[in-house]
Amino acid sequence: MRIAILGGCGFIGSNLAIFLKKKISKIKILSVDNLSRKGSSINQKRLKLLNIRNIKKDISKIDTLKRIGKIDLYINCCSDPAIENSKKQTSTVIKNNFYTTLQMLDCAKRYNSKIIYLSTSRVYSIEDINKLNKKKDYKKKFNINKKINEKFNTSKIRSIYGLTKLFSEELIKEYSYLYNLKFLINRCGVISGPWQFGKQEQGLFSFWIKKHILKEKIKYIGYGGYGNQVRDVL
């Protein structure tokens, strides 16, 4: 089985590649990552220790994935996930998040490849989320039945980042219908763990821990600066 992990030197991609390599013996894993994000070159070294090759190419370009040849499964982990960055560098975020999906799908239809696409909870409407009732007392366990699920509204404004991921989801569905491709979409929430290079705009919990270890100040913006918001962490 030949697996290509797009964004394989990122936080999720590298951990997935290493996990799969250790768990499945008869498997060929390729990482495709242009190493544009800080810390990705460190993850490339981790992959190399397990003989996982990284192809340093821009996935949004037409020929990058075609040159790799037949792939049985694409795991698409690549994206530009920062909300603030999507406001400042809109064209770049669209290229990194949407065009990469398009190139993957054009190759998948050629070889009838399966697809796992990591999307985001940011596809949901910010306006409708802000209308939800809020409370500050979480001394008792909150009601898990009041969670936001995949049926929540996605038709209103969310963010440029969320829009690129939602467009990618819809394009995958269209390709699946037209070319009978099998796919799975996971709308990830807050993800944290080893080898996450936390920054203020992405990797919140790693960033938070780093700040505490270094005894640096943290600025909370939720609930008027008190930081009382509750999030799920995977």
Q: How would you label these PLM feature ranges?
A:
Residues 86, 148-159, 183-197, 208-233:
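A conserved pocket-lining segment of Rossmann-fold NAD(P)-dependent short-chain dehydrogenase/reductase
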Residues 97, 101, 201-206:
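Amphipathic alpha-helical segments in well-structured domains
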Residues 37, 197-204:
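Short acidic-hydrophobic sequence patches enriched in Asp/Glu that either
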Residues 118, 203, 229:
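A conserved catalytic-core signature of glycosyltransferases
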